[in-house]
């Protein structure tokens, strides 16, 4: 949530900044509601003051034995008027809150202008795409003889699901363990296990609700949703807290399944594991003091990059333009891995700095040692990495002419020493 003061005191400038990301809204309606809120608040305060004054007068009159019936009638009338004004104020505040929850974060000054992914700016590249001496297959063709089964998944659940059997399932698990080990042992993250069902308040807190409900799987008649990312429960670990300065930064890592309806993605990436209803991620979340969040963003991005580098997967880092930012993000780096089967780079991680946008929604603060007063923390998160996409990137980049897949040395200890996955015909 944006600081309401920005909208109250700098409405025109804030509206211009929101326009950078293509967001249009009824600023005039907000201004009208805000004026009414101020009027109702002043009226409420005046009526409360009058009621308090009348209460004292009634007390004195009663002590002196005077007739207080007229004063009581006036007090009742004041009380009724106050209730009416307070009820209207509550309605106006709820309308303003609804508007605020639907406004995205402001793009950072270093976020490039642009409308969509075509305007994203490349920051750097790492690695060289493999020079294969044969026509590379994509992960679907490779996986057909390695235990990647989409047809069975359709029978079990429907489209946009997959089953992995045998060595590919083991490789999938190995990637998860490898990522967790690197992040906990080398990058200083604390591993957490969280629920895979989240309540509405949690999803409002991180910004998925109320705007993106159609993209979520809701559990009917329960108030629960399947989590679209571990960002939701992990960030909400500090909801409603005032953290001591010595606890910061908090660095959490969690492996969870993620569930997304992919509403609005009809016809996109229908082949393979690129866009699934259910997929696994290892998620990085940081809760930090405001003055270090910019550096924390660079560090977190580097932590995700380290996994790709250890696996020897070529990638590039993209600074997302304002029009391509996620709802809650102020600045985002996308890591895009090279896929020989598609002859292009595809997103494998998004690393974002939300500043105090999520913190305001979840009421997460820290006690600033300089002022000894509570202040908003900054929140950041990124995938470290998306496991399914890492799996298919390994398959495509390490494929051999016979359809076998070489296992990077760094993963071989997690695979019981296996160095090559050999294709086999399933009967």
UniProtKB/Swiss-Prot annotation:
- Which Pfam families does the UniProt record give? Seryl_tRNA_N, tRNA-synt_2b
Which sites bind L-serine?
Answer: 229-231, 283, 383
* Gene Ontology biological process terms from the UniProt entry: selenocysteine biosynthetic process; seryl-tRNA aminoacylation
What InterPro entries does its record include? Answer: aa-tRNA-synt_IIb (IPR002314), aa-tRNA-synth_II (IPR006195), aa-tRNA-synth_II/BPL/LPL (IPR045864), Ser-tRNA-ligase_type_1 (IPR002317), Ser-tRNA-synth_1_N (IPR015866), SerRS_1_N_sf (IPR042103), SerRS_core (IPR033729), tRNA-bd_arm (IPR010978)
Assigned GO CC terms? cytoplasm
Q: Which Gene3D superfamilies match?
A: Bira Bifunctional Protein, Domain 2 (3.30.930.10), Serine-tRNA synthetase, tRNA binding domain (1.10.287.40)
Q: Which keywords fit this entry according to its UniProt record?
A: Aminoacyl-tRNA synthetase, ATP-binding, Cytoplasm, Ligase, Nucleotide-binding, Protein biosynthesis
Which reaction does this chain catalyze? tRNA(Ser) + L-serine + ATP = L-seryl-tRNA(Ser) + AMP + diphosphate + H(+); tRNA(Sec) + L-serine + ATP = L-seryl-tRNA(Sec) + AMP + diphosphate + H(+)
**Localization, UniProt:** Cytoplasm
What Gene Ontology terms describe what this protein does at the molecular function level? ATP binding; serine-tRNA ligase activity
Biological or metabolic pathway of the protein: Aminoacyl-tRNA biosynthesis; selenocysteinyl-tRNA(Sec) biosynthesis; L-seryl-tRNA(Sec) from L-serine and tRNA(Sec): step 1/1
Q: What is its EC number?
A: 6.1.1.11
Q: List ligand-binding residues for ATP.
A: 260-262, 347-350
Q: What does this protein do?
A: Catalyzes the attachment of serine to tRNA(Ser). Is also able to aminoacylate tRNA(Sec) with serine, to form the misacylated tRNA L-seryl-tRNA(Sec), which will be further converted into selenocysteinyl-tRNA(Sec).
Family per UniProt?
A: Belongs to the class-II aminoacyl-tRNA synthetase family. Type-1 seryl-tRNA synthetase subfamily.
Q: What is known of its domains?
A: Consists of two distinct domains, a catalytic core and a N-terminal extension that is involved in tRNA binding.
Quaternary state and partners of this protein? Answer: Homodimer. The tRNA molecule binds across the dimer.
Q: What is this protein called?
A: Serine--tRNA ligase
* Naturally occurring in which organism (per UniProt): Nitrosococcus oceani (strain ATCC 19707 / BCRC 17464 / JCM 30415 / NCIMB 11848 / C-107)
The top of its lineage is: Bacteria, Pseudomonadati, Pseudomonadota, Gammaproteobacteria, Chromatiales
Give the gene name. Answer: serS
């Amino acid at each position: 949530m944006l600081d309401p003061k920005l909208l109250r005191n700098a409405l025109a400038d804030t509206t211009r900044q929101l326009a950078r990301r293509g967001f249009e809204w009824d600023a005039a309606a907000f201004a009208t509601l805000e004026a009414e809120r101020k009027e109702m608040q002043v009226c409420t305060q005046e009526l409360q003051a009058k009621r308090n004054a009348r209460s004292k007068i009634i007390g004195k009159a009663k002590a002196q034995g005077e007739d207080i019936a007229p004063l009581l009638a006036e007090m009742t009338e004041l009380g009724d008027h106050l209730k009416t004004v307070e009820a209207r104020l509550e309605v106006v505040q709820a309308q303003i809150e609804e508007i605020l929850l639907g406004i995205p974060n402001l793009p950072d000054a270093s976020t490039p202008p642009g409308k969509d992914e075509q305007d994203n700016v490349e920051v750097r590249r790492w690695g060289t795409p493999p020079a294969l001496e044969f026509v590379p297959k994509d992960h679907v063709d490779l996986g057909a003889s390695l235990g990647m089964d989409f047809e069975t998944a359709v029978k079990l659940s429907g489209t946009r699901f997959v089953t992995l059997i045998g060595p590919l399932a083991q490789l999938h698990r190995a990637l998860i363990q490898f990522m967790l080990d690197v992040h906990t042992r080398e990058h200083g993250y604390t591993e957490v296990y969280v629920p895979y069902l989240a309540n509405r308040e949690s999803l409002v807190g991180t910004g998925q609700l109320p705007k993106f409900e159609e993209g979520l799987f809701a559990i009917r008649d329960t108030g629960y949703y399947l989590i679209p990312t571990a960002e939701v429960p992990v960030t909400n670990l500090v909801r409603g807290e005032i953290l001591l300065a010595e606890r910061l930064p908090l660095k959490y890592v969690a492996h969870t399944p993620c569930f997304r309806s992919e509403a609005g993605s009809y016809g996109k990436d229908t082949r393979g594991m690129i866009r699934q209803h259910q997929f696994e991620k290892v998620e990085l979340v940081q809760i930090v003091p405001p003055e270090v969040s910019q550096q924390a963003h660079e560090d977190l991005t580097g932590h995700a990059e380290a996994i790709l580098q250890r696996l020897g997967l070529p990638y590039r880092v993209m600074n997302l333009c304002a029009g391509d930012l996620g709802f809650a993000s102020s600045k985002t780096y996308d890591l895009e891995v090279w896929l020989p089967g598609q002859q292009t780079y595809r997103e494998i991680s998004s690393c974002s700095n939300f500043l105090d946008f999520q913190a305001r929604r979840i009421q997460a603060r820290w006690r600033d040692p300089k002022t000894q007063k509570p202040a908003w923390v900054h929140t950041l998160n990124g995938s470290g990495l998306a496991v399914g996409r890492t799996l298919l990137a390994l398959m495509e980049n390490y494929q051999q002419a016979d359809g076998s897949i070489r296992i990077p040395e760094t993963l071989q200890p997690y695979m019981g020493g296996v160095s090559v996955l050999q294709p086999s015909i399933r009967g």
